[in-house]
Amino acid sequence: MKKTNLLSSLVAASALLFASLSFAADETQQDANGVILSGHDAVSYFTMDKAVKGYAGISAVHDGAIYHFSSEANRDAFKANPSKYAPQYGGFCAYGAAIGAKFPVDPTVFAVIDDKLYVNNSANVSKLWNAKQSKAIALADKKWSSIREVSAGELEADDDLDD
């Protein structure tokens, strides 16, 4: 009887864990292993002004996503203040968020503006985003709360950025 209750509890706990990880995966742009930014070190964007590949052995979890780091010092800085280093819009394309969509990113296409990390889908998309950067950030900030928990496939892009 005790084994049955324990098993039931473990199954229920596992279901809750997987549900929370699945939920978080919709809120952050991750690979199949749950890694964000394709394994690039989130802190390096700020300290080195470039995308530096991190190591799986030096990692931290934030908002359901696994972050890799190029050094323990960077990991520790991230853990001390993850909201400072985590990419905006869950690591989805900043331009996409501005038009109400979630697109994957190329983590080497980025900008740090006002101490916030923005990543985009490609160099071409980044050019579009840069041309209307202030408006794009304002729109994305406004829209993110309503699209954050919606899966990418359920969203339809709009043309608000073109107005």
Label each region the model flagged:
Residues 19-21:
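N-terminal signal peptide c-region/cleavage motif recognized by signal peptidases
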Residues 10-11, 140:
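Generic hydrophobic, helix-prone segments enriched in Leu/Val/Ile
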Residues 23-163:
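Charged, low-complexity intrinsically disordered segments
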Residues 1-10:
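Bacterial N-terminal signal peptides that target proteins for export
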